[in-house]
């Protein structure tokens, strides 16, 4: 990163001008091949990407030589029906150009984020990227709030909106024209972006570029919260600043306050409530407030109008659900979360008079939703729709130990992700399904019965499904009648993406 930063300072690229000459540099394609910039700060799913064996220095040199030709892009456009300028299967060189372009547009924003973290003296921010770090924030804040809103971030209705979003940050016109050309080659210029089909297609073709565009789009949608935070006249905690850095995409837009202040001068009084908290993961976000239901409805009304009028985004009102925290459980990041009232009776006696007081304490609860999780296991062929374990087909050349290790790894990953559950009974049922499915798979392989196979295997199968959390809890907490191990919650700081089986959306 330091070498890259020095190169940009020497050639004047720090001012976001003339990014397109970087397409002629070999190290850009090396970064694209290795998913550079330290694993890409932007990406939430980059660990799942695979390397392409065709990315060699010889291919890159040939690609740069072709791009030096003045009529290369013109010929590619005129012959797009035969070659397919952007299609990965039809033109490998064009796919490499789009991947290199994705790295280039990330560079200024990555440097801006690193400098922002250095100014705030945030030495270690990787722990804050963990998904589990959101739930302690919920636990600390939501117990004092009244209402919660489930919000789905709207999708842009036209491709040009994505290009216009980057114009505020990148003044390099050729780079923006190249981005526009890539987008219109994927879809027709008159087509609309559909939430599922087009995004899944684009993410498979060039996931890095898609994530960059999507994050920049979401950041624009969330910019209203930065503005409203600055408009609040109440004191704010210092921890909120670091939380804002990892929630939003990159930094802050300096002129945003002036622009929005001129556009919405009469509605600022609606947002003076300091007890408003916002959390997002991917396209779903949670907005919680201590205000009245009237205030929350005003939030909904102005968010919808702000997105539609200022960013030309179509947001249906039913994409924002308003509920009271005491009567509603919201689904977020694979957990079913709610605020429960736990009543307790306190008896006190003063001289001859005795008093009894009933108190209710709000407590944040997180549980594992058993029905959606069983549906995910049924889709993965571990059980049927009713949760009955079945044998999973595996390759015949796999040994028994390899099959047991695979089942055990799946069970440990699920237990690791759902370690913050308040009630572990649902998780114990999932472990039972995976363990019995493993036994059925092995008994089917050996053409034996499950009972006979479990009797022969003994405790070896059980030890493979014993998670590290259970071993640690048995050492930290002694087994006493008052101790309830199924109520212990553990949040980890190494989880940067949602578990596939836990993602039911």
Swiss-Prot record:
InterPro entries: Domain_X (IPR024937), Maturase_MatK (IPR002866), Maturase_MatK_N (IPR024942). The keyword tRNA processing applies. One of its GO terms (molecular function) is RNA binding. Keywords: Chloroplast, mRNA processing, Plastid, RNA-binding, tRNA processing. It comes from the Eukaryota. It holds the Pfam family MatK_N. One of its GO terms (biological process) is tRNA processing. GO terms for cellular component: chloroplast. It is found in: Plastid, Chloroplast. Belongs to the intron maturase 2 family. MatK subfamily. PANTHER family: MATURASE K. Usually encoded in the trnK tRNA gene intron. Probably assists in splicing its own and other chloroplast group II introns. This is Maturase K. It comes from Calycanthus floridus. The lineage of its organism: Eukaryota, Viridiplantae, Streptophyta, Embryophyta, Tracheophyta.
């Amino acid at each position: 990163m330091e070498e890259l930063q020095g190169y940009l300072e020497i050639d004047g690229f720090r001012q976001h001008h003339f990014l397109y000459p970087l397409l002629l540099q070999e190290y850009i394609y090396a970064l694209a091949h290795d998913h550079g910039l330290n694993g890409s700060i932007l990406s939430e799913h980059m660990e799942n990407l695979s390397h392409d064996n065709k990315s060699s220095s010889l291919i890159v040199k040939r690609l740069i030589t072709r791009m030096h030709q003045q009529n290369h892009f013109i010929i590619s456009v005129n012959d797009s029906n035969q070659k397919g300028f952007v299609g990965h299967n039809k033109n490998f060189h064009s796919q490499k150009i789009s991947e290199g372009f994705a790295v280039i547009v990330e560079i200024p924003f990555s440097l801006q984020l690193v400098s922002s973290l250095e100014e705030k003296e945030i030495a270690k921010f990787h722990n804050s990227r963990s998904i589990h770090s959101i739930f302690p924030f919920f636990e600390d804040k939501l117990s004092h709030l009244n209402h919660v809103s489930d919000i789905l971030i709207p999708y842009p209705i036209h491709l040009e909106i994505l290009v216009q979003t980057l114009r505020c940050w990148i003044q390099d016109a050729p780079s923006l024209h190249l981005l526009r050309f890539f987008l219109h080659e994927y879809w027709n210029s008159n087509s609309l972006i559909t939430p599922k089909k087009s995004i899944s297609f684009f993410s498979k073709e060039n996931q890095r570029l898609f994530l960059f565009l999507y994050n920049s789009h979401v950041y624009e949608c969330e910019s209203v919260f930065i503005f409203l935070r600055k408009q609040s006249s109440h004191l704010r905690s210092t921890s909120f600043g670091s939380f804002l850095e990892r929630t939003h995409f990159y930094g802050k837009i300096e002129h945003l306050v002036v622009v929005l202040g001129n556009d919405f001068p009469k509605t600022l009084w609606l947002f003076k409530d300091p007890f408003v908290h916002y959390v997002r993961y991917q396209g779903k976000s949670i907005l919680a407030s201590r205000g009245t239901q009237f205030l929350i409805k005003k939030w909904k009304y102005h968010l919808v109008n702000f997105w539609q009028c200022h960013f030309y985004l179509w947001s249906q009102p039913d994409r924002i659900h308003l509920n009271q925290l005491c009567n509603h459980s919201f689904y977020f990041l694979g957990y079913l979360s709610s605020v429960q009232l736990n009543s307790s009776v306190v008896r006190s006696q003063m001289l001859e008079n005795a008093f009894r007081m009933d108190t209710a304490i709000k407590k944040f609860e997180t549980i594992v939703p058993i029905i959606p999780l069983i549906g995910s296991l049924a889709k993965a062929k571990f059980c049927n729709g009713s949760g009955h374990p079945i044998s999973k087909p595996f390759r015949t050349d796999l040994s028994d130990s390899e099959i047991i290790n695979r089942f055990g790894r799946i069970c440990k990953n699920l237990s690791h992700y759902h370690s913050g559950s308040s009630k572990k009974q649902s998780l114990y049922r999932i472990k039972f399904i995976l363990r019995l499915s493993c036994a059925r798979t092995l008994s089917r392989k050996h053409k034996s019965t499950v009972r006979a196979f479990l009797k022969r295997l003994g405790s070896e199968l059980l030890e493979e499904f014993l998670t590290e959390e259970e071993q640690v809890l048995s050492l930290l907490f002694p087994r006493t009648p008052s101790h309830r191990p199924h109520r212990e919650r553990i949040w980890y700081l190494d989880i940067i993406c949602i578990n596939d089986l836990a993602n039911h959306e």
